[in-house]
């Protein structure tokens, strides 16, 4: 409880929600709660409860400071093993930029040795003064480790809340949109004409980021808003600690302007850039909970997403999986559209065994996203619908026959509509860089496009 009729929990606790109910300890009444905002990257959700009875006698929690190592911590929740409240105690083991499993992102996290189990998610963690130092959210499980739990610190929680208050919605944590390499090797620094033991090398710039206008591959970032960046990709943190460079970025908000000190060709210069959330070509979560889909003569098209990959991992080809892992969006709104399955009918004879194949073009026009595909189908006046797939496979349907068969196919398979509700409206092409859509290749990256990259390489 944080006051003003609002509650906090983990985003994964209310994922795909249709109705959320909450109740207080010692109360036998459940109250309906409304999800106001859901932060996938930070795994936080903001809820509101309108009933005055729920808030009677309730006191909001006080947010405490970021703890120190070995500070005592108490975790409260309702984990597996019983129905009543559970309290476990431990100490703070580590504070660093941590991988958030739910959003595949990296933000500041607190590692503790107090027991955290399924059901603890969304519960508060307290210090000895009774102040809330964060929200329990995940645990590390391994045969070689035990008692490694994680808490979202109040600094991340406060950023989420301020983002919501500023914009009336949650916009997300921003990024620079670059792939960086550490500069710990002296020969590498000398080759790049970096005079001191500092800086990180720009290896890739995301086409959708604002810094694509000011940074180039081969630039070396040596400062961020005046803070020096070390050659191992860290910056000063508190009095005598260092932390990953991306921590500074996570303290900013979408739309904030920053000053970068860079070395280019041996010369130092300063550039300005605007931060904004990362554009994911393949989203980790489906916004709204329901996937977009379009059915054309039994051919079911949908955007590629991580949930789809997890569901169909055995049937998704290596080429498509590689593209999902290593490609970057070249413009906002870009999607990888796949034919997920075929609802067998005489109109699509010969295509029944197709599944999880990427569709590239319709009647010669490259497909930008699922809504664009729906628009191309609707606006087609020719005799045929010609779909071009990856690996040069061709699917041709007679347009009139396809339209005539649609209603019977939907009826046979018990499907209420040929497309999802988000595709019902008119298509608006808002893509600014139209030349990017004509290119055949996506922005391939030398490393996985997951936030945490690989050893020596990091996304920021």
What are these regions (language model features)?
Residues 2-85, 118, 268-270:
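Conserved active-site neighborhood of the chymotrypsin/trypsin-like protease fold
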Residues 55-62, 69, 232, 246-247, ...:
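C-terminal, low-ordered peptide segments at domain boundaries
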Residues 50-60, 86-146, 195-198, 203, ...:
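Active-site region of chymotrypsin-like
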Residues 13-15, 212, 223-261, 361-391:
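PDZ domains, with a preference for the canonical peptide-binding region formed by the helix
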Residues 6-11, 66-79, 91, 112-116, ...:
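Active-site-proximal beta-strands of protease catalytic cores
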Residues 1-4, 29-32, 87, 121-122, ...:
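A conserved glycine-rich beta-strand in the N-terminal activation segment of trypsin-fold
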Residues 1, 115-135, 211-217, 351, ...:
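Catalytic nucleophile loop of clan PA
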Residues 166-227, 302-352:
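PDZ/PDZ-like groove recognition
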């Amino acid at each position: 409880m944080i006051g003003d009729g609002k509650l906090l929990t983990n985003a994964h606790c209310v994922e795909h929600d249709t109705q959320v109910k909450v109740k207080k300890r010692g109360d036998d009444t459940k109250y309906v709660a409304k999800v106001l905002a859901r932060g996938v990257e930070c795994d936080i959700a903001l809820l509101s409860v309108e009933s005055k009875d729920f808030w009677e006698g309730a006191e909001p929690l006080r947010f405490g400071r970021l703890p120190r190592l070995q500070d005592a911590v108490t975790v409260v929740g309702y984990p597996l093993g019983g129905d009543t409240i559970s309290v476990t105690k431990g100490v703070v083991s580590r504070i660093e930029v941590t991988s958030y499993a739910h959003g595949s992102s990296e933000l500041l996290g607190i590692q503790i040795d107090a027991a955290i189990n399924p059901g603890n998610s969304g519960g508060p963690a307290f210090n000895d003064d009774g102040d809330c130092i964060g929200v329990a959210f995940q645990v590390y499980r391994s045969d070689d480790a035990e008692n490694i739990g994680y808490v979202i610190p109040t600094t991340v929680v406060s950023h989420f809340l301020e983002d919501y208050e500023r914009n009336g919605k949650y916009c997300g944590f921003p990024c620079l949109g670059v792939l960086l390499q550490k500069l710990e090797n002296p020969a590498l620094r000398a080759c790049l004409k970096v005079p001191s033991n500092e800086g990180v090398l720009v290896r890739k710039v995301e086409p959708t980021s604002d810094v694509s206008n000011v940074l180039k591959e081969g630039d070396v970032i040596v400062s961020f808003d005046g803070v020096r960046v070390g050659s191992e990709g860290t910056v000063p943190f508190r009095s005598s600690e260092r932390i990953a460079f991306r921590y500074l970025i996570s303290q900013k908000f979408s739309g904030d302007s920053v000053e970068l000190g860079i070395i280019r060709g041996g010369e130092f210069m300063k550039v300005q850039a605007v931060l904004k959330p990362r554009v994911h070509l393949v989203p980790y979560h489906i916004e709204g909970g329901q996937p977009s889909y379009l059915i054309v003569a039994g051919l079911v098209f949908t955007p590629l997403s991580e949930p789809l990959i997890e569901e169909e991992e055995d049937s998704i080809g290596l080429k498509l999986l590689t593209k999902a892992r290593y490609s970057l969006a070249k413009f906002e709104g870009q999607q990888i559209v796949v034919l997920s399955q075929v609802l067998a009918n005489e109109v699509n004879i010969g295509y029944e065994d197709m599944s999880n194949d990427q569709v590239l073009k319709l009647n010669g026009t490259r497909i930008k996203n699922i809504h664009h595909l729906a628009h191309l189908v609707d606006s087609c006046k020719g005799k045929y619908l010609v779909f071009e797939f990856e690996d040069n496979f061709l699917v041709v349907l007679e347009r009139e026959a396809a339209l005539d068969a649609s209603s019977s196919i939907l009826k046979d398979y018990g499907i209420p509509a040929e497309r999802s509700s988000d595709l019902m409206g008119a298509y608006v092409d808002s893509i600014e860089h139209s030349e990017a859509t004509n290119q055949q290749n996506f922005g391939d990256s030398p490393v996985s496009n997951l936030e945490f990259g690989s050893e020596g390489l990091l996304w920021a």
